[in-house]
């Protein structure tokens, strides 16, 4: 109904690095098996509604402390480690027959020995590992080519297609990239047959998703049709199931609006504004006093904060 035939989700990265600046809560967790189960469930739900799922960021962006939007992360692991952690959810997604895969901008020396070459441009990674070894036959996308983890390379679209990707995402200069691909075909550097094969593959998926027919997009009233009472109840139950209570002294939780509550302190760490939604919700149950632990506080300021909370 919305006219979105593909969704660049789910994130299949195993988030085992607490310093990861970009994956963190986008991941389903730190256990490869549990991540795999949720990836397959989420993607299967998308595809049951004729939306192409795209698992990302192959071969795994979970254990990095660099954001590939800003630089090129390195996965310095052995192949055995990659197989048991990073690659595990992707292999399970392939086994489940899911349709799309996005290759991230990552340096993986054990698979691609050329220093500085991102996995998204590496034929060893895209064709050798994903297509040949893991036998993935679905659509292969690059991560956005405007990202700093890859953007320093020349002729990005051509390199990405030659590496084995079927579709390139968000190139910065499409007007220059298209002639580069055409020129490579004319010079025999990139085969016309390979380009045609990619085009037929993309068209096959478009046909399967019903894109050969005129879409019947009805935006009017869409919010009401999507946000049904059943949907809201499902969201509530998912939220409840996702909560882990570490400490519940004197059984203060759950909070009750009809029960008299003592004043509550909310200790916030980091930038202002990030807990405004939580503070607003807590304020409906009791009077709330907010405290903030800021970076660079003096010992005297920290002492005042401790005294206020004690």
Please identify what each model-predicted range represents.
Residues 1-6:
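Catalytic domains of carbohydrate-active enzymes, especially glycoside hydrolases
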Residues 12-22:
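Short, conserved phosphate-binding/catalytic loop or strand-edge motifs used
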Residues 13, 143-146, 266:
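Conserved acidic functional residues
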Residues 23-24, 111-112, 222-223:
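Flexible glycine/proline-enriched surface loops and loop-helix/loop-strand junctions
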Residues 21-29:
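Short acidic, glycine/Ser/Thr-rich loop/turn "cap" segments at secondary-structure junctions
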């Amino acid at each position: 109904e919305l006219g979105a035939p593909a969704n660049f989700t789910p994130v299949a990265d195993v988030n085992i690095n607490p310093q990861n600046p970009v994956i963190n809560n986008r991941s389903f967790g730190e256990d490869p098996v549990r991540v795999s189960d949720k990836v397959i469930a989420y993607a299967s739900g998308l595809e049951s509604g004729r939306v192409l799922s795209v698992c990302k960021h192959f071969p795994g962006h979970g254990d990095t402390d660099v954001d590939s939007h800003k630089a090129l992360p390195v996965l310095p692991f052995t192949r055995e480690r990659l197989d048991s952690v990073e690659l595990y959810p992707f292999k399970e997604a392939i086994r489940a027959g899911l349709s799309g895969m996005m290759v991230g901008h990552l340096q993986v020396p054990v698979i691609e020995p050329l220093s500085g070459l991102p996995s998204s441009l590496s034929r060893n990674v895209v064709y050798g590992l994903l297509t040949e070894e893991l036998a993935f036959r679905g659509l292969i996308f690059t991560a956005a080519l405007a990202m700093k983890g890859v953007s320093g390379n020349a002729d990005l679209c051509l390199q990405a297609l030659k590496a084995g990707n079927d579709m390139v995402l968000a190139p910065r200069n499409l007007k220059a990239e298209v002639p580069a691909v055409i020129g490579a075909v004319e010079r025999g550097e990139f085969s016309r047959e390979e380009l045609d094969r990619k085009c037929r593959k993309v068209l096959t998926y478009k046909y399967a998703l019903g894109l050969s027919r005129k879409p019947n997009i009805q935006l009017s009233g869409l919010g009401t049709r999507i946000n049904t009472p059943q949907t809201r109840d499902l969201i509530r139950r998912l939220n409840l199931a996702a909560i882990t209570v570490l400490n519940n002294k004197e059984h203060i939780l759950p909070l009750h609006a009809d029960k008299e509550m003592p004043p509550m302190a909310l200790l916030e760490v980091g930038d202002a504004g990030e807990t405004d939604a939580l503070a607003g919700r807590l304020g409906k149950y009791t009077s709330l006093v907010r405290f903030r632990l800021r970076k660079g506080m003096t010992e005297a300021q920290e002492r005042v904060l401790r005294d206020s909370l004690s």
